[in-house]
């Protein structure tokens, strides 16, 4: 995969070099590049200007963004604009992006964008209903969530297939050694070696956690008969 990031602050992305993203680069699975679009700005390197019609704040000008993307060697890339008004990013969207060969992220600053920038864009994406000072943190989050899904980036395919949200449910509780830590013990079923009982326990606990913490996920999750029965049992216990 090839990722190009347009930003005024490329140094902010340094932590990615020591993360799973850096390992993907080392393995040759990812080519990631940062472009300071101020370098392509006309008018004394100014990237922003006042909005026509008046109003608060400054807007990113279209010219530096267009000229920077024109110089990127890309073949039909997915172009993502980080915008609080965009569609909310989630796990299914990360899985979708992980199937792409080329991605471009545009990180904004100031009050907003010249609307004409959006003519370049395929996706307008937000992390949620809040505003950050810039798009860099959002881009780092999305890149990390996407890159870890590229085949062979992390050790085992199943290790991310069982993640919370990948299955549509929150992940079940997990334990490691020691068995007894300060009086808190591992559930006996996990020590039993009975694979079917373990599978059913994990499913029940996954449903329980989802029901208690994110019931909205269950509204769109297609329950099978076993899951319906377990969920009914959980509700009776409440």
UniProtKB/Swiss-Prot annotation:
GO cellular component annotations of the record: cytosol
Per UniProt, subcellular location reads as: Cytoplasm
Q: Which domain of life is it from?
A: Bacteria
Show the catalytic activity. guanosine(37) in tRNA + S-adenosyl-L-methionine = N(1)-methylguanosine(37) in tRNA + S-adenosyl-L-homocysteine + H(+)
Instruction: List, alphabetically, the InterPro entries matched.
Output: Alpha/beta_knot_MTases, tRNA_m1G_MeTrfase_C_sf, tRNA_m1G_MeTrfase_TrmD, tRNA_m1G_MTases_N, tRNA_MeTrfase_TRMD/TRM10
* Keyword list, A-Z: Cytoplasm, Methyltransferase, S-adenosyl-L-methionine, Transferase, tRNA processing
Sorted alphabetically, the Gene Ontology BP terms of this entry are: tRNA N1-guanine methylation
Q: Which residues bind S-adenosyl-L-methionine?
A: 108, 127-132
Question: Is Transmembrane given among the entry's keywords?
Answer: no
Entries under Pfam families matching the protein: tRNA_m1G_MT
- GO MF assignments: tRNA (guanine(37)-N1)-methyltransferase activity
Reply yes or no: does the keyword tRNA processing apply: yes
Q: What is its EC number?
A: 2.1.1.228
Q: Which family does it belong to?
A: Belongs to the RNA methyltransferase TrmD family.
Function text = Specifically methylates guanosine-37 in various tRNAs.
Q: How does it assemble?
A: Homodimer.
Enumerate the NCBIfam families for this protein. PRK00026.1 (NF000648), trmD (TIGR00088)
What protein does this entry describe? tRNA (guanine-N(1)-)-methyltransferase
């Amino acid at each position: 995969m090839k990722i190009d990031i347009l930003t005024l602050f490329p140094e902010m992305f340094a932590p990615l070099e020591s993360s799973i993203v850096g390992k993907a680069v080392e393995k040759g699975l990812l080519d990631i590049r940062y472009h300071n679009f101020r370098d392509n700005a006309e008018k004394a390197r100014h990237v922003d200007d006042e909005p026509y019609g008046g109003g608060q704040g400054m807007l990113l000008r279209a010219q530096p963004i267009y000229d920077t993307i024109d110089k990127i060697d890309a073949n039909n890339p997915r172009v993502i604009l980080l915008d609080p008004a965009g569609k909310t990013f989630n796990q299914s969207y990360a899985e979708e992006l992980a199937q792409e060969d080329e991605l471009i992220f545009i990180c904004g600053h100031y009050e907003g964008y010249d609307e004409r920038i959006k003519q370049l864009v395929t996706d307008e994406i937000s992390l949620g209903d809040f505003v950050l000072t810039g798009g860099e943190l959002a881009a780092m989050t999305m890149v990390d969530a996407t890159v870890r899904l590229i085949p062979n980036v992390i050790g085992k395919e199943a290790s991310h297939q069982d993640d919370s949200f990948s299955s549509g449910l929150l992940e079940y509780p997990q334990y490691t050694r020691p068995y007894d830590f300060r009086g808190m013990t591992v559930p006996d079923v996990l020590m039993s070696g009975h694979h079917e009982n373990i599978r059913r326990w994990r499913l029940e606990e996954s449903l329980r956690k989802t029901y208690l913490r994110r019931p909205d996920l269950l509204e769109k999750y297609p329950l099978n008969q076993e899951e319906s029965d377990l969920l009914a049992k959980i509700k009776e216990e409440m």
